[in-house]
Amino acid sequence: MNYQSWIQHFRTNRLDRPEPDWSAPFSMPEKRRRLLARSIAEYQLGDGGGECCLVAQDAEAFRATGEEVREVVDLWFAEEREHSRLLARAVRRIGAEFVTTTFAFELFYAIRRRLGVQFEMLVLLVVEIVSTGYYRVLRRHVGDQPLADMCRLILRDEARHIDFHRDRLAARHPAGVGILWKWWFRLLGEACVWFLWLGHGRCFRALGGTRGEIFRHLRRGQAAFLAKLAKRCATTQHVTTGTTGTTGAHLVSSPIAH
């Protein structure tokens, strides 16, 4: 895996980030505003508002496997903190109160802590894909330019986070991921999107969104990820088996891949 390429991406991506015009007038029917306020406040907590780092019991051992590993993980989570900052501005814009905990938030962190860093990173990948659906639906239906602009910024980042996970997994599985992994990937996606709908469905409906939109975004996102991962794995396998020296070995044994 090309660590330096991803480190450079995260550093460069800090630039050219036009801030939404938070001072623009805000107007929304009260019922819709109230539901949106709760939804965005909960998302602000989950999207970098808690412990914005790997929290699995073996996370520090994983980060300590190399300076490049530590740096790329830290840069990735720095971008998540930026999302939390943007969402905090959105919370203030719509007159919401900040949320300090929810059942879903506590469950999310409990799972991440107990099941190991590789499972945690799988969960985070799935959440990135589910969140893409959340922000797309919000951007389409919110009817407020600064909030839509915030969604565009976050979606730009999320797309590259998903690519980052694809490269990481291709380095670990040059022959492709197995059926069990795909099963877990799909199952976690369905579980996460149901949690999303149960927690935010009233907001989506008030804005004009539907359950079908959210579920379609998840399933299309997962299908696209698996297709791109298979293509990348084929390329990685060719490099690994077709070269000698350190390049192929690095792709297979890279610490971030295991």
Predicted feature locations:
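Non-heme di-metal
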Residues: 1-258
